[in-house]
Amino acid sequence: PTSPASKSKFQFVTPQEAARRIGGPVRTIVGLEPDHIEIGPASGVPGAQPNLSVVRVVYMTADGERMLLDQQRIPADANGFHPIDDPTLESGQTAYGTETNGVSVATWLDDAGYRISLAAKVPVDSLKLLVNLVR
C-alpha cells in the first residue's frame, strides 16, 4: 500500500533531517505528539513559496484524521526582511479559511521568517487555539 507521503511526493524524514533541510528548528504544537515528519516540494502545498522545501509535521487527531503543520523558512533579504508573495502574511496577519470538506486552514509568517500553515478538520475557533500553541 502507498503511504499518504508517497502519494503527495512527500517523504518521511527524521526530526534532525527536517531541521537541517529547513535551516532551523522545526515548529511543533506544544503539548501534542507528532505522528511523523515529512518533507516535500512547495508544489504540494497551496500558497507555499516556490523553490523552498516544505517540512510537514503530521499529527493524528482522536478521530483518526490527519492534522498538518506545514512550514517553510523564508530566507531574509539584505535588510533582514523575509519577502513573501502574500500581502496579508507580510502585514503580520494570520489568514483563516475553511474548505468545503470541513478542513480549516490557518496561514501565517512568524517572527523568525517561517511561513506556516496548519490544516485540520476542526472549526476555525479550535484552529485559532492550536495556532497559539505553535512554537
Residue locations for each model-derived region?
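Short, solvent-exposed recognition patches
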Residues: 2-114, 119-132
